[in-house]
């Protein structure tokens, strides 16, 4: 590992501006290439039950955004691939690593239901089980782009890439509804951005930063540290279209948001590493995506460039936990 003393997180970093070369931020190009596809934003909503469902996946794909469907209604996945392909859209699904998931991978391969993207999605992705799953997918569906995770070390990134992963997802428990760090003592909570930097340095393929994103500026910071794509949970939760339950408290509307290993999601009290919270209702998801795009265009203009590559070259300073001056986000 790198120097373990020089760790930092999103709130510790400020990017330093360069001379602006565009007349308006609307000229800035926020698009990103992943595999054989180009997407409108370097952002993907988290593949969680309270963030994405079939309808949202379809809307995102139609509008040119990347998405990853969650794996918590396993029996619907084959039909989902079929429907997306029938509509001329890309299919991007999640799988686990157990025997029944391997059977599912064999089944869709045999039926020629080949998704463009598969994300192997487990909490501790630096595992033999993940390596075996990558190898199985690549053997049966060599054209499918495989994202594997989640990991938090350069060693893990190298191993998963060597096994055949096309991208790795970095982040162990830094998310708002993830309590891995509390329950286990392990994780990248508090130093997620440093983990992204170290992992991206070791990577020869794209890295997806996953977790700990609290503001749109954090997306720009992730790209500066080497992420190709940024997975966002809580910022995408609690919208009009979001799957979570709407709850009214004292005249204000809230929506449920829970972690992928929470008892609410698992329906049990076993191996719980997630919690449930209520977030204020946020209006339309399309409005949030537009605002994200505009903020990222502003970031590019501050970086002195015309596209996302400008963000990878800016200088930054470490200002330990002080950019909020004690204010909560």
Curated annotation (Swiss-Prot):
Its EC number(s): 1.7.1.7
Catalytic residues (UniProt): 178
GO-annotated molecular function: GMP reductase activity
GO CC terms of this entry: cytosol; GMP reductase complex
Alphabetic keyword roster: NADP, Oxidoreductase
Pfam family, one: IMPDH
Family as reported in the entry's similarity comment: Belongs to the IMPDH/GMPR family. GuaC type 2 subfamily.
Entry function: Catalyzes the irreversible NADPH-dependent deamination of GMP to IMP. It functions in the conversion of nucleobase, nucleoside and nucleotide derivatives of G to A nucleotides, and in maintaining the intracellular balance of A and G nucleotides.
Matches recorded under NCBIfam families: GMP_reduct_2, PRK05458.1
Protein name (record): GMP reductase
Gene: guaC
């Amino acid at each position: 590992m790198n120097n373990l003393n020089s760790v930092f997180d999103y709130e510790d970093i400020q990017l330093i501006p360069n001379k602006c070369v565009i007349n308006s931020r609307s000229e800035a190009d926020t698009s990103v290439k992943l595999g054989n596809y180009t997407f409108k934003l370097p952002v993907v909503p988290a593949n969680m039950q309270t963030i994405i469902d079939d309808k949202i996946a379809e809307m995102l794909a139609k509008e040119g955004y990347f998405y990853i469907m969650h794996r918590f209604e396993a029996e619907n996945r084959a039909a989902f691939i079929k429907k997306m392909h029938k509509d001329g859209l890309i299919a991007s699904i999640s799988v686990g690593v157990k025997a029944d998931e391997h059977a599912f991978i064999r089944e869709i391969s045999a039926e020629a239901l080949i998704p463009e993207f598969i994300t192997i999605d487990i909490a501790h992705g630096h595992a033999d089980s993940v390596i075996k799953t990558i190898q199985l997918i690549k053997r049966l569906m060599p054209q499918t782009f495989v994202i594997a995770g989640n990991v938090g070390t350069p060693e893990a990134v190298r191993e998963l890439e060597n096994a055949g992963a096309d991208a790795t997802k970095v982040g162990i428990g830094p998310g708002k509804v993830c309590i891995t760090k509390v329950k286990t003592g392990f994780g990248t909570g508090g130093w997620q951005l440093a983990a992204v930097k170290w992992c991206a340095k070791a990577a020869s393929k794209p890295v997806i930063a996953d977790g700990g994103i609290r503001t749109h500026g954090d997306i720009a910071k992730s790209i500066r540290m080497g992420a190709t794509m940024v997975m966002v949970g809580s910022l995408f939760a609690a919208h009009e279209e979001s799957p979570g339950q709407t709850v009214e408290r004292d005249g204000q509307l809230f929506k449920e948001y829970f972690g992928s290993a929470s008892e609410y999601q698992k329906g049990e009290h076993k191996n719980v590493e997630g919690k449930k919270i209520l977030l204020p209702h946020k209006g339309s998801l399309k409005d949030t995506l537009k605002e994200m795009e505009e903020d990222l265009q502003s970031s590019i203009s501050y970086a002195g460039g015309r596209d996302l590559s400008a963000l990878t070259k800016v200088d930054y300073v470490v200002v330990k936990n002080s950019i909020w001056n004690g204010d909560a986000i």
